[in-house]
Regions:
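Hydrophobic transmembrane alpha-helical segments in integral membrane proteins
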Residues: 10-37
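Hydrophobic alpha-helical transmembrane segments of multi-pass membrane proteins
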Residues: 36, 58-76, 199-210
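Internal transmembrane alpha-helix with an interfacial aromatic "cap," most often the third helix
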Residues: 41-48, 77, 93-125, 131-139
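Membrane-interfacial loop-to-transmembrane alpha-helix junctions, especially the N-terminal start
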Residues: 51-63, 115-123, 189-192, 260
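Extracellular-loop-to-transmembrane junctions of the mid-late helices
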Residues: 142-170
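C-terminal transmembrane-bundle signature of multipass membrane proteins
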Residues: 167-170, 191-261
Length: 261
């Protein structure tokens, strides 16, 4: 059995992990991000029982997105509190899993209107390009920052983002939504497109705060702002995406029940 000294030591270690400095808003966003993602996961998963069968998979994907993010935020929180550094590798592992799943939501919403699997693969390929280029731009940035390196890989990453943005607003996703017989789906896809336009645009702000980034050199915004913008963007986009899908599923289910009543 553990003695009182060992138990006190373990208790102190556990408390040290959970201590959030009062003057550190970034640590606060890591903790709240973890709790918000976990709560959203539980909500989306259990709400599957309230929607028609054809919407259950969409809500499951929403729950997976926030659950994967919650797990990574748990470890990113501890990493940040222990080191004070950006958890770049953990963050990009999270994004590599969750961003393609967000593309899956577009496919599932437009599948009934004739979306083919090729659309899904194109969206996933664009998201992978966006993330791989962004990771190279951050993880392999020379010490002290290199503006040319940051800008080059930022532009490459933006190509993937622009493709997804165009597809959601004017391309295949937008056309399939317009051709669907559901006003709910049309409005839902347009709302998700707004998330891609406005919500995803927060990430480049964080990217440009790292050493060598435009905001770092122009305004003196340091690397500590990278995680602040990323954490805010994750909460808005991942939970927001899920809430839009949830709204579509609930509304469509209620309308279907009203028709059959």
């Amino acid at each position: 059995m553990l003695g009182s000294k060992q138990l006190n030591f373990l208790n102190m270690e556990l408390l040290n992990v959970l201590v959030i400095p009062k003057d550190d808003p970034i640590a606060f966003t890591f903790f709240t991000g973890y709790m918000a993602m976990l709560a959203a996961s539980i909500f989306f998963f259990f709400e599957r029982s309230r929607v028609d069968d054809k919407w259950k998979l969409s809500l499951l994907v929403s729950a997976l997105i926030t659950f994967i993010a919650a797990v990574h935020y748990y470890y990113m929180r501890d990493y940040y509190l222990a080191t004070g550094e950006n958890p770049t590798a953990l963050r990009y592992i999270d994004w590599t899993l969750t961003v393609p799943l967000m593309c899956v939501e577009f496919y599932l919403l437009t599948k009934a209107a004739g979306a083919k699997i090729s659309l899904l693969w194109k969206l996933i390929a664009a998201s992978v390009l966006m993330l791989v280029a962004g990771y190279i731009g951050e993880a392999f940035n020379p010490e002290g920052g290199d503006t040319a390196h940051s800008v080059f890989w930022g532009v490459i990453s933006t190509i993937g983002y622009i493709y997804i943005l165009y597809t959601a607003w004017f391309g295949e996703v937008a056309k399939l939504a317009a051709a669907s017989n559901s006003e709910i789906v049309k409005k839902g896809v347009r709302t998700l497109a707004w998330f891609v336009l406005a919500g995803w645009a927060i990430y480049p702000i964080g990217y440009m705060c790292m050493p060598g980034g435009w905001l770092n050199t122009a305004f003196g915004w340091g690397s500590e702002n990278v995680d602040l913008f990323y954490n805010i963007a994750d909460a808005i986009n991942k939970i927001g995406f899920g809430l839009v899908v949830y709204g579509i599923a609930i509304t469509a289910t209620e309308q279907n029940k009203a028709k059959t009543a």
